[in-house]
A protein has these predicted regions:
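Donor nucleotide-sugar binding/catalytic pocket of nucleotide-sugar-dependent glycosyltransferases
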Residues: 31-71
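Short hydrophobic beta-strand element within catalytic cores of glycosyltransferases
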Residues: 176, 181, 185-188
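Nucleotide-activated donor-binding/catalytic signature segment of Leloir-type glycosyltransferases, i.e.
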Residues: 124-145, 157
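Conserved acidic donor-binding segment of nucleotide-sugar-dependent glycosyltransferases
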Residues: 190, 200-210, 219-224
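Acidic donor-binding loop of glycosyltransferase active sites
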Residues: 153-169, 184
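A charged, aromatic-enriched C-terminal amphipathic alpha-helix characteristic of glycosyltransferases
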Residues: 70-71, 208, 222-251
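A structural motif in glycosyltransferase catalytic domains
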Residues: 82, 97-100, 114, 213, ...
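Conserved donor-binding/catalytic core segment of Leloir-type glycosyltransferases
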Residues: 37, 74-92, 98-101
Length: 251
């Protein structure tokens, strides 16, 4: 077989475009591709900014979330007000949710329950912060063996206030779309490609801003039914068959 007849497709997801120490190798790989598929407009823009000599043809944005099924979540007795389904990394912003919960409790007398599903290097530090903010009765760390579905079905809002660090960015935010498919409104920050993972089914706040998180949480619950309905509609855009067609049309 002549390998030159095989179409070469490159998927760009975010963090790899920060590795400027590997600039020549990455640029060479990108320029060999017949098509580059980005997981967000942010990732595409960042790639062109970091790699000035990138060829300007055959670039496509396809959001990577695939939703197999959207069904109404009829659980009206949810255990958690907030949840975050994500790897336990600093850039995911769990610590900012703790700060917001502390403000809500101390200044607004609002007590929320928060589920964190995931594993990662921040676990020990996050547990220390729970003690610092006296949130032991409000925050549960869920073992990663528990399914995303179980957490989403038992939570009201998905919150992921990501922050940008020199070595890491959020290219998109698949868990926000997955949460929306269970009717959860989403609160995210304006960091990286995260804002592209929600529509009118949530609120975008400035990154690293607990006070804006507080306002967003209050606003979401004031209009909860409306945001929840919009979440189902938004998630429908990521239904598996639609996404497969996007990829097939691209290649």
């Amino acid at each position: 077989n002549n390998t030159t007849d095989v179409k070469k497709i490159c998927l760009a997801h975010g963090n790899e475009i920060l590795k400027l120490s590997d600039e020549n190798r990455i640029l060479n790989s990108l320029n060999k591709a017949d098509l580059i598929i980005y997981n967000s407009q942010f990732t595409k823009n960042k790639t062109f900014k970091n790699f000035k000599n990138l060829k300007k043809f055959n670039h496509k944005i396809i959001y990577p979330a695939f939703i197999k099924k959207i069904s109404e979540n009829k659980n009206n007795k949810k255990k958690y007000d907030l949840c975050t389904v994500a790897r336990l990394e600093y850039r995911k912003g769990h610590h900012l949710v703790f700060e917001a919960m502390s403000i809500l409790r101390n200044e607004y007398k609002i007590i929320l329950k928060y589920a964190i599903l995931g594993d990662g290097p921040e676990l020990s530090r996050l547990k220390d912060l729970v003690l610092k903010f006296s949130l032991q009765k409000q925050v549960d760390f869920i073992h990663h063996d528990v399914s995303n579905e179980k957490i989403f079905k038992n939570s009201s809002v998905h919150i992921m206030p990501t922050i940008t660090t020199p070595e890491s960015i959020e290219g998109f935010g698949i868990s926000n779309v997955e949460a929306a498919s269970y009717g959860l409104p989403c609160i995210v920050s304006n960091s990286g490609g995260t804002p592209e993972s929600i529509g009118n089914n949530g609120i975008i706040v400035k990154e690293n801003n607990p006070k804006q998180l507080v306002k967003a949480i209050i606003d979401i619950f004031k209009k909860y039914k409306s945001y929840s309905r919009k979440s189902y509609l938004f998630a429908n855009n990521f239904e598996s068959n639609k996404k497969i067609k996007e990829y097939l049309n691209a290649i």
